[in-house]
From Swiss-Prot:
Belongs to the bacterial ribosomal protein bS21 family. Residues 35-57 are annotated as: Disordered. The lineage of its organism: Bacteria, Bacillati, Cyanobacteriota, Cyanophyceae, Acaryochloridales. Pfam families: Ribosomal_S21. This is Small ribosomal subunit protein bS21. The keyword Ribosomal protein applies.
Amino acid sequence: MAEVRLGENESIESALRRFKKKIQKAGILSEVKRRERYEKPSLRRKRKQEAARKRNR
């Protein structure tokens, strides 16, 4: 889990910016969006195969 500690003279806005960057790098937001709805295993395999094809081009 991403954790950000507020520095002595640090504003909340800058700490929030750092937190958002950490979450983006960790891929937490994209995973949450992906898990919003159930994905059938066959569709999951299909999506992974398409992603692999795009990477190998």
